[in-house]
Every structure is written in C-alpha cells, then in structure tokens.
C-alpha cells in the first residue's frame, strides 16, 4: 500500500488519502462525514460507483492492518454534488486546491 496522507481543514476535519498509480483515493467515510451525510456508509453505497478496499495501518496499533473503503476522485465529486449542505461548494474548492494548486489555504 502507498503511504497514507491526511488532508486537514478546520471546517471539514481530516480526510485520509492514498495515492495509487498516480491517482488519489479518498477515504469514503471521511469524505461523506465531512459533507454532512448522516449515514456515510449508506451515502457511499448510494452515490459511489468505484469503491475499493485497501489495507491501512490500524490507528491504535500500527502493527495491525484494517480494511478501509476508498473512493476515486470521480466518486468524491458525486458525493459533493449529492450533498445538501451549503458548505459542499467550499469543500469542493478546498479539495480542488489540494489536488491542482500548491496553495491549499483557501
């Protein structure tokens, strides 16, 4: 597995991300929770098309692995589009800045 990164934002919290074959995969539960879905797992099932499972280090025990649900960028935008929160647009701008510019402070 590639190294996990954590993208942090004061408004949206932390999003765990891995890079695989030059593309980012986002922790689906982190994204759905940041976008205000009351049931993040259900939101992933209903809106995401290309869900993948990857092993990641266990947060309390780095020697152990846990299986996590990751989504590609296209599914990230699907969750944004279906979110009913007004902050979804700000979330989209923040992620876009992280992925496509060097200034992610916006």
Stretch-by-stretch model annotation:
Residues 12, 20, 42, 84-85:
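Short capping/connector residues at structural and topological boundaries
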Residues 53-98:
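Short, well-ordered secondary-structure elements
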Residues 32-37:
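Non-catalytic, well-ordered alpha-helical segments in soluble enzyme domains
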Residues 20-21, 74, 101:
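A short, sequence-level motif marking secondary-structure junctions
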Residues 1-29:
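N-terminal intrinsically disordered, low-complexity, charged/polar
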Residues 100-106:
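Conserved small/polar residues in nucleotide/adenosyl-binding loops
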